[in-house]
Amino acid sequence: MRDIIDGFLRFQRDAYPARSQLFKSLATRQAPKALFIACSDSRVVPELLTQREPGELFVIRNAGNIVPGYGPQPGGVSASVEYAVAVLGVGDIVVCGHSDCGAMGAIASCACLDQLPAVAGWLHHAEAARAMNSAHEHASEAARLDALVRHNVIAQLANLRTHPCVARALEQGRLNLHGWVYDIESGRIDALDGASRRFVSLAEHPEVRAVGGEPGQAVA
């Protein structure tokens, strides 16, 4: 814990003064342009990946970058999505999976989660991804996991569309959905292209189209 406190002290001493005007402008309002939904994994840092400043991203993080489908008892993720879209008016939502995802690894390996009932219950929201992945052959366990990570991004994009605020914003043409997969070792990001319905290198195709139509029809 001491290193975390030391980090805060360095922030207060060095980083904050250098950006004091930015923080002053953010003291009473925020106007992020995008909602970024990522995994809780400590190796995935949305602001670092996108080189965004404070106030530019509205971020949701949880195990497996999961968005439960909208239901009669919406939870914290649903509330955060609704606030980002209906109140903050974000124009883009990114669902970002990543390599070596522990949540997806548990699904891919059919790990016993009897001792982790909350985790087991949470991962049921990725059942569609598991089903999609099981319908394909995989050359190795590593390939199975990589494909599952992509299928999960596709599944969570589909879940997003069940949220009334998202469906409404999409219909009105004021919201775009994006599916990304971040490779930790290489720094590469593959993005789901709305035109080809396949994942392509974001560095090689920065003009990649947002996801339209039915995300579930995409190819991992």
From Swiss-Prot:
Cofactor(s) for this UniProt protein: Zn(2+)
Catalytic activity: hydrogencarbonate + H(+) = CO2 + H2O
GO biological process: carbon utilization; cyanate catabolic process
EC number: 4.2.1.1
SMART domains: Pro_CA (SM00947)
Sequence positions that bind Zn(2+): C39, D41, H98, C101
Molecular function GO labels: carbonate dehydratase activity; zinc ion binding
Keywords: Lyase, Metal-binding, Zinc
Note on cofactor: Binds 1 zinc ion per subunit.
CDD domains reported for this sequence: beta_CA_cladeB
InterPro entries, per database record: Beta_CA_cladeB, Carbonic_anhydrase, Carbonic_anhydrase_CS, Carbonic_anhydrase_sf
Family: Belongs to the beta-class carbonic anhydrase family.
Protein's UniProt name: Carbonic anhydrase
Source species: Pseudomonas aeruginosa (strain ATCC 15692 / DSM 22644 / CIP 104116 / JCM 14847 / LMG 12228 / 1C / PRS 101 / PAO1)
